Amino acid sequence: MQRRKFTISLLSGAALSGLATPSAQAGSLLSSLSEGDAASGIRAALERGAESAVGLLGKTDGFLGNPKVKIPLPGVLKKAAKLLKATGQGKSVDELITAMNRAAEAAVPQAKELLVGAVKSMSVDDGRKILTGGDHSVTDFFSAKTREPLGVKFLPIVTQATEKVALAEKYNAVAGKAAGMGLLDKKDANVQEYVTGKALDGLYFMIGEEEKKIRKDPVGTGSDILKKVFGSLK
């Protein structure tokens, strides 16, 4: 019964508010969907994006082996890394970069519970925005609902992984000075917080990649409900 009310509110609310873009196309879509399809399609897209991102990133080389999300040293520290490599400390630099990415890979599986929780708590307004929004509406939904609590959850895992590397302490010392001189963003002045932020960026980026696939080729997903809901938007 609750699901029925959700769907009726979603369909009628979107039609009345004119939130669709373009409105005529979205209005036609919303009126053509059978009861329950809208909510089911949106939840399926959310779940698919979350599971895909966590599965791809939360494993060995999920970050380190993917150039799109690999975590590098931040700007000004790349220059310091070059100096270290020139003095024979290249191995230490590589160890730090590897540790940063391994930390992100270890943290990402912890995201699944919160992402699933966000899907279950989706409101009627959230549903409207996702269905009639732009190409990144699923990604934006997850980021808005989970970024802060995931950051809290990721940080201890990242800290535990990076503190094993001696150069991490030097990173914080050098980065702290660089931030004090305005050469580095303050949020990047601590290796643990920097990696946590980049891990979240990578997670939402990969959710976005899956969202693009769903919107571009809903038939190719092999899901009848995704094909019906998102295929009608094309």
PLM features per residue range, with description:
Residues 53, 123, 218:
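Residue-level signature of catalytic and energy-coupling elements of molecular machines
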Residues 202-234:
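A cross-kingdom marker for long, charged
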Residues 27-99:
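N-terminal Sec/ER secretory leader and immediately downstream segment
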Residues 157-198, 202-203:
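An amphipathic alpha-helical core segment
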Residues 1-14:
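N-terminal secretory signal peptides and thylakoid transit peptides that target proteins
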Residues 21-26:
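Sec/Tat signal peptide C-region and signal peptidase I cleavage site
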Residues 90-161:
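Mid-length scaffold segments of soluble, non-membrane domains
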Residues 34, 38, 49, 92, ...:
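Helical mechanochemical/support elements of P-loop NTPase systems and associated helical scaffolds
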